[in-house]
C-alpha cells in the first residue's frame, strides 16, 4: 500500500495530463 505522498510523487513523473482540453504540466500544482 502506498502512502498519499508516494502516490502524489508517482503522479509527478513527467507524464502529460490533459484536463478539460488543457495540458496540465504539473499535476500537483494544478
Curated annotation (Swiss-Prot):
Homotrimer. Keywords: FAD, Flavoprotein, Monooxygenase, NAD, Oxidoreductase. It catalyses: pyrrole-2-carboxylate + NADH + O2 + H(+) = 5-hydroxypyrrole-2-carboxylate + NAD(+) + H2O. InterPro entries: AcylCoA_DH/oxidase_NM_dom_sf. SUPFAM superfamilies: Acyl-CoA dehydrogenase NM domain-like. One of its GO terms (molecular function) is oxidoreductase activity, acting on the CH-CH group of donors. Disulfide bonds: none annotated. Its EC number is 1.14.13.130. Monooxygenase that initiates the degradation of pyrrole-2-carboxylate, which allows Arthrobacter sp. strain Py1 to grow on pyrrole-2-carboxylate as sole carbon, nitrogen, and energy source. To a lesser extent, can also use pyrrole, pyrrole-2-aldehyde, and indole-2-carboxylate as substrate. It is an enzyme of class 1 (oxidoreductase). This is Pyrrole-2-carboxylate oxygenase.
